[in-house]
Amino acid sequence: MIRKFSNGYELNSKILDGINKLADNVATTLGPKGRNVILFHKEQGVPVITKDGVTVAKFVELEDPFENVGAQIVKQAAEQSATRAGDGTTTATVLTRAILQRAQKYLTAGVSPIEIKRGMDKASEAIVDKLKEI
C-alpha cells in the first residue's frame, strides 16, 4: 500500500489548491449571470447540464489526495448550507475560499491558527448581530 504524507506549508497549500479548484468550478454558476455547466455522469453515461452549484460540487473529485481533502471538506459544508437553507451552496463555497485564502496569508506570516479562529468567531458574532438588527 502506498501512502502519501505531507505537512506544514506544503499541506496547507495543497488543501487550499483543492478548495480553489472546487470554488473555480462552482463559481461559474453564481448569480443571475451564472453559466450552465456540462458534467458527464459516469454511471448513466450521459451529460448533465446544470446551473446548480451543489450539483457541480457533487461531481468534483480531485486526483491529488490532499487537494481532494480540501475540496471534500468545503463541499460538505456547502451541502449543509443547501440542506438547511435550500440554497447558498455556491456562495458558501466562494466565501469559504476567500476566508481561507486570507487565513493562509496570516498563517504564512506566523500568526497562530488559534488566533485566526478567534478572529473568525468574533467576526461571525458581529455579522449575526447585524443580521438580527435588520
Regions found by a protein language model. Name each.
Residues 1-134:
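N-terminal glycine-/lysine-enriched basic segments
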